[in-house]
C-alpha cells in the first residue's frame, strides 16, 4: 500500500498539499502517483510569479512510462519551485513527500481556506485510490 501521510490534504488527481503558512502551501505528487508513473525523468514546472488556477494544469511529470499533467489544488501565485528537480527529477520517486516537492503557492488566507476545504483528507484519499 502506498504511503499516505495523515497531516496532508489530497486532490483526486494525486497531488498532496501541505499548509506552510496562513496563505501558503507546498504541493507535490503522492507516493501512489509516483509509483504508478515509474521512474521520473523530467519535471516541467511554472515560473515563480506565475498564477495557477484550481483544477487546471500547471506543469507535467514525465516518466519512462508516460507524461502526466500536474493540476493546481488551489488558485494562487507560484512563490517557489523545487529547483533540485531540474538536475535530479528522481527525487519525486525517492522522496515524494519531502525532497521531491514541486511548488509553493500563495494566496489570500480566506481563498486558501476555501480551497483546502474542498480537498480530501488522508482517509478520503485512501478510499479514492482503493476504487
UniProtKB/Swiss-Prot annotation:
Q: Which domain of life is it from?
A: Bacteria
What are the entry keywords?
Answer: Lipoyl
State if Zinc is listed as a keyword: no
Q: Tell me which Gene Ontology terms the entry assigns under biological process.
A: glycine decarboxylation via glycine cleavage system
Per UniProt, residues of the Lipoyl-binding domain are: 24-106
Report the residues modified as N6-lipoyllysine.
Answer: 65
Q: Which InterPro entries match?
A: Biotin_lipoyl (IPR000089), GCV_H (IPR002930), GCV_H/Fam206 (IPR033753), GCV_H_sub (IPR017453), Single_hybrid_motif (IPR011053)
Q: Its GO CC terms? A: cytosol; glycine cleavage complex
Give the required cofactors.
Answer: (R)-lipoate
Q: Quaternary form? A: The glycine cleavage system is composed of four proteins: P, T, L and H.
Q: What does this protein do?
A: The glycine cleavage system catalyzes the degradation of glycine. The H protein shuttles the methylamine group of glycine from the P protein to the T protein.
Q: What is the similarity comment for this entry?
A: Belongs to the GcvH family.
Q: What is this protein called?
A: Glycine cleavage system H protein
The scientific name of the source species is Mycolicibacterium vanbaalenii (strain DSM 7251 / JCM 13017 / BCRC 16820 / KCTC 9966 / NRRL B-24157 / PYR-1)
Amino acid at each position: 500500500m502506498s504511503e499516505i501521510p495523515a497531516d496532508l490534504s489530497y486532490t483526486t488527481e494525486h497531488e498532496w498539499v501541505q499548509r506552510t503558512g496562513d496563505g501558503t502551501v507546498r504541493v507535490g505528487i503522492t507516493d501512489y502517483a509516483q509509483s504508478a508513473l515509474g521512474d521520473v525523468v523530467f519535471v516541467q514546472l511554472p515560473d515563480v510569479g506565475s498564477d495557477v488556477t484550481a483544477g487546471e494544469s500547471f506543469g507535467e511529470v514525465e516518466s519512462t512510462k508516460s507524461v502526466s499533467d500536474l493540476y493546481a489544488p488551489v488558485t494562487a501565485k507560484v512563490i517557489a519551485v523545487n529547483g533540485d528537480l531540474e538536475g535530479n527529477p528522481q527525487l519525486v520517486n525517492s522522496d515524494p513527500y519531502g525532497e521531491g516537492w514541486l511548488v509553493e503557492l500563495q494566496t489570500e488566507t480566506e481563498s486558501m481556506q476555501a480551497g483546502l476545504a474542498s480537498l480530501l483528507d488522508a482517509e478520503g484519499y485512501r478510499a479514492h485510490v482503493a476504487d
